[in-house]
Amino acid sequence: MEKSRFITPNRIVIIALFLFSAMASAHAQTFLGTTGDKLWSNADNWLGGLKPTEMFSEVTVSADVIVDEDVNIGTLNNAGNHTLTVLAGKTLIVNVAIDWGDNDFILEDKAELFYSNPLKVGIKKAIKAFEEDSHLWNLIASPVREDVFPSTENGFITDPETRYVLYSFNENTAGWINFKETPFALENGKSYMYANALDTTLIFEGTTIGNQAECHLSYHAENGAYAGCNFIGNPLPCYAFLNRSYYILSEESNSIIAVANSETKSIAPCTGTILNSEGPDDNDVWFSYMPFFQYLGYQGYVEITVAKSEVPSLVLDQALLSFNEGDDLAKISLFDDAPKVYFTQNDKDLAIFSVDSVEVQPLRFKVKENGSYTMHIEPKGREVEYLHLIDNITGSNVDVLVHPDYTFTASTNDYSSRFKLVFKPDYGIEEFENQNFAFYSNGTIYINNVETQNVASLQIVDMKGRVIYQGDVSGNVSTNGWVPGVYILRLVTDRTVRMQKIVIK
C-alpha cells in the first residue's frame, strides 16, 4: 500500500505528546436540546451556551441532535436513548471514541463520518427518478460491513415494484445479474447499477469499517475486452480516494467518465466506480479517507468529450490524454449505443493515455449510430501553445484553442483512426498531397507510391459521400460491380491525409 507520509519514531513521540496535551486540556460540553430545534449549531442548545470548538472536546448528548454544520471533536457519548442525524453534505469528525449503543446514528445523503473504529449506522443515498422511456442509472455502493438485501423498508423496492431496476456485474462471466430474476445482497466494496422511476432514498444499515479499506480485483482473460473489468464501490462512510485511475458514472447522462489517478479526486459515499485489472497479478486496490500521494509537478491533461450535436452539453463519452505518469486506463464501453472516443497503444484501447510529451497523437472514434456529433477538446491544468484537431476523413484542420467544439457527421462505416491531435505547428501535416498514389485500369484500382507500413487506412467514397470501400492498404482494390463515375480516395498515414479523384468507366 502506498503511504501518504512517513512517520519516524521521533515524530511518533511528538504526536503522542501533542495528543496527550490536547486531551488533557479538552473541555467537556453537553448538548441539552433546550430550544427544541435539535440543531448542533444553536449555542442555546448547549449547557452554559458553550458549543464544542476543539478537536478533542468531550461531548455528551442528552437529547436528539441534528448535526447541521461541520464538526471536529474528540469523543461523543450518548447519555440516553437519543438519536443523531448528520445533515446532507455535512461532516462529523470524531478523533477518539464514540459511545452510542444501538441508537439511531444517521448520515443523510453525502454526509461524512470520519471515525477509525466500527460504528452502527444508517447511511442514506438519494436517488433521482428517471424520465419516462429512459433510465438515469446510478452506480451505487454499500458503505457498511454487513450485506444489505434490497427491500421496501430500505427504499430499494418501491411501489409499483416494476419501476425499479437493480443489476450486479458478474466479473467471472462479464455478464449482468438482474435482481428481479436472481435476488442478491449488496456487498461492501462492490458497485451496482440502480435506477428508479420514483424519487427514493436508499438506506444502508450496518457497521462502518473505518477510514480505509482494501478491495480485491479479478481478471478473466477469456472475457476479452472485459477481462479486467471490476465494479468496485466506495466502502467508507466518507469521501474516499483511490490509488489508481477509475471510472465514475455521469450524473447528467448515461456515460462513464474516466478520472485520472493524478487528479486525486475523491469519490462520494455510497458511490460506485469501475476499475480495470491489468492482469492476474493486479488483484487489489485501496480506498482511503485521504489522498495516497500528491503529484509534484502536475502536468495536466487534454480532455476530449463527445456528444450528439442536438444536445452538445450531454456528454456521451470521454477520453483523456494525460501528461502524468501512471494514469493509463483501459477503455470500457458500458452502454452499447454510446459513441466511443479513445487512444490505442500496443493494440490496447485506452480511455486515459499517459505520455511524457507528444507532437502528434492519433485519436480513434467509433459510433454505433449514424448522425451528427460534437467533439469538445480542452486542455486542463496545462498551458498549451498549439493544439489542432485533424479530421482524416474531411481533411479539416481545426485550431481547438480558438474553436474547442468541432461538429461532424459520423457513420458506422467510418474507420476508427479518424482524428489526430497535433501539438507542433511545424509538424508538416499536409491536408492534401498532389502526388497521385493510385490509378485505375480494367476493373482494378492499383495503389502505389505508398510506404504501406505507415498507412492507417484507405477509404473510397462516391460523389454522394457513401463509403464504397474501407480498409487497410494491403493490395489492389477490385471495382467489380461498382457504378461508373467519379470516386474520391482518402489515404491516411501517420503523417498525412492524401486525397485523389479516380474515374471508373
Name each region found by the language model:
Residues 370, 414-416, 484-486:
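Extracellular Ig-like/FN3 beta-sandwich strand-entry sites
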Residues 34-62, 66-68, 72-73, 77-297, ...:
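N-terminal exported-region signature
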Residues 1-30, 426:
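Bacterial Sec-dependent N-terminal signal peptides
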Residues 258, 328-360:
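Edge strands and adjacent loops of beta-rich recognition modules
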Residues 359, 364-367, 433-505:
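C-terminal outer-membrane/trafficking sorting elements
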